[in-house]
Regions:
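Catalytic cofactor-binding cores of redox enzymes
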Residues: 1-213
Length: 213
């Protein structure tokens, strides 16, 4: 396979694959390792982040909220109970913003070297999205998906159980961006479907490897 997730599942014995994926041999994608649905079968302790908040407020807005609450702390109990958490929010927002900017810089470099006009335009769109989100509120469907992916992937990288991140009610927090883009002529249904497919392909690459004694 072209990614670790595909190679990992294909390397499993057939009996092991069907233990996880079930006896339905018509489920070729799951059984052969072509794709692994994210947050479906891995663990019972799944949860969903507040993706709507990162899409609508951005890291800058969340950071400002945390800083305001830090400034307002005046009780000794809150210094112990709340201050470390709020400081962690500020650090996390800064780290996530820095991480996204690195992707923006990389996409810009790749676009400068790209000779294919279509791919060059795609890379420029990726660079523009990564330069804006998740630091700032999402303005388009593409930016909303990009911000959502940064948020969930940051959690996946931070801890092992981050692999069980649920997507939550995507229909609710993504629809306003989709509707606005379609109404204003920036997006077609086919383009939105392709962007969602790209998101799912990225999620399928998140495969856990657990060592056994």
């Amino acid at each position: 396979g072209k990614d670790f997730g595909t190679s990992f599942v294909r390397a499993l014995p057939e009996a092991t694959r069907f233990y996880f994926f079930g006896p339905d041999r018509s489920n070729v994608a799951m059984a052969t390792g072509v794709g692994i649905c994210s947050a479906v079968w891995r663990h019972s302790q799944n949860w969903a982040h507040d993706f709507a908040k990162i899409l609508n407020k951005g890291c800058a807005g969340i950071r400002a909220e945390a800083e305001a609450r830090l400034t307002a702390i005046d009780e000794p109990f809150d210094v112990v109970e709340k201050k470390p958490f709020l400081e962690a929010i500020v650090i996390t927002c800064d780290a996530l913003t820095t991480w996204a900017r690195r992707y923006a810089a990389l996409a810009t470099e790749m676009a400068a070297r790209e000779s294919n006009p279509q791919r060059k335009r795609e890379l420029e769109e990726i660079a523009a999205a990564c330069a804006h989100v998740p630091e700032h509120p999402s303005r388009t469907f593409r930016e909303a998906l990009q911000a959502q992916w940064f948020a969930q992937m940051f959690s996946r990288l931070e801890q092992n159980i981050g692999g069980q991140v649920s997507q939550g009610r995507m229909d609710q927090y993504l629809y306003p961006f989709y509707r606005k883009d379609v109404e204003e002529g920036r997006l077609t249904k086919a383009e939105a479907e392709e962007l969602l497919q790209c998101l799912w392909l990225n999620m399928m690459q998140s495969t856990e490897v657990k060592m056994s004694p």
